[in-house]
Amino acid sequence: MLGEEAEPQWISEEVKTGTTIIAIEFNGGVVLGSDSRVSAGDSVVNRVMNKLSPLHDKIYCALSGSAADAQTIAEMVNYQLDVHSLEIDEDPQVRSAATLVKNISYKYKEELSAHLIVAGWDRRDGGQVFATLGGLLTRQPFAIGGSGSSYVYGFVDAEYRRGMTKEECQKFVVNTLALAMNRDGSSGGVAYIVTIDEHSTDEKVILGNDLPTFFDQ
């Protein structure tokens, strides 16, 4: 009506982490990474969301899809892992966390729109990466997801090799994110990196200006 301000379109759009996420195993641990842009339709509603969510001390998940759905799954699994850890009086296994994510994703697959990559370290199997798309559980040496992943499949296929060191995996993750954030309009902001091994869980933020550049930038 005349005299009333029109409601911005993004208010009625679903908020999505429309996104680039990645996780990779190295001998003794894992490296996870994500961009930080959150969008609703064509609007950016958050430029610095951390999409790497802790599920337990040495288990993280990378979030993509609907921000609300992905965060809800992560919070449910975090709670269940805390209870499970108290029951068994030891840290949970990475596969247990991934199985919980898989079960929730499959049970509510008609209602939820989220893809979580679960990665971490445990004493039984060391560093592990699991993809849980649509309720399917697969362990992989590395996994990528989100809208930005379609722009970097060629890069990761060409650059990945088994047996990379921790430092090489960190560089691989950062370069993959930088390329995806340059190509994908729904990815951007800063890069969040988490490195997990037996001895530590290290979180790092790389500002956009500090990300590597490539020949077309």
From Swiss-Prot:
Q: Which residues form the active site?
A: 19 (nucleophile)
Source domain of life is Eukaryota
Keyword field contains Isomerase: no
Give the UniProt subcellular location, in the record's own words. Cytoplasm; Nucleus
- Cite the EC number: 3.4.25.1
Question: Signal peptide span per the entry?
Answer: none
Q: Which reaction does it catalyse?
A: Cleavage of peptide bonds with very broad specificity
Q: What is its main location?
A: cytoplasm
Pfam families attached to this UniProt entry = Proteasome
What PROSITE patterns does the annotation carry?
PROTEASOME_BETA_1, PROTEASOME_BETA_2
Please name the top-level EC class of this enzyme: hydrolase
Which InterPro entries is this protein grouped with?
Answer: Ntn_hydrolases_N, Pept_T1A_subB, Proteasome_bsu_CS, Proteasome_sua/b, Proteasome_suB-type
- What is its biological role? The proteasome is a multicatalytic proteinase complex which is characterized by its ability to cleave peptides with Arg, Phe, Tyr, Leu, and Glu adjacent to the leaving group at neutral or slightly basic pH. The proteasome has an ATP-dependent proteolytic activity. This subunit is involved in antigen processing to generate class I binding peptides.
**Similarity annotation:** Belongs to the peptidase T1B family.
The name under which this protein is listed is Proteasome subunit beta type-9
